[in-house]
Amino acid sequence: MRNYLYTIIFAWLFCSQAYAQSIPPLSLPSIFSDHMVLQQNSKVKFWGWTNPRTTVRIIPSWGQDTIIVKADNRARFEVELQTPPTSKKNYQIEVKIKDRDLIIKDVLIGEVWLCSGQSNMEWNSAKGIQDVKDELPHANNSEIRF
């Protein structure tokens, strides 16, 4: 009975390990997500992780080229994406390995501004912008993202 139990456990472990290796992981850092904005007319570093030496295909919808890269021994891949001039069009970036893929949707290309400074970021519109209550209902520009 004891040998039978060990055989079942060993078979289960072997099968689960083989299954886990058959589905390669694919992940991106959280800064690459739906509704993001990329800087126009620039080379943007784009990276992620998968199994070591796995071929990764990156397909930005603004270009006609598929970028092919191979993950290194530490399971990391990195490319530079050439972005087009600004536009009102929503793009997507497809990242594919074997039978798995990730799609980043609603990507805008435009100007990316980085706001910093403790006192600057603490300031809000109630502290000195004239007519803020009249202007806020009309502030509905979907092309500005925070």
Where would I find each of the regions flagged by the language model?
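Cell-envelope and extracellular/periplasmic
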Residues: Q21-F146
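Bacterial Sec-dependent N-terminal signal peptides
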Residues: M1-I23
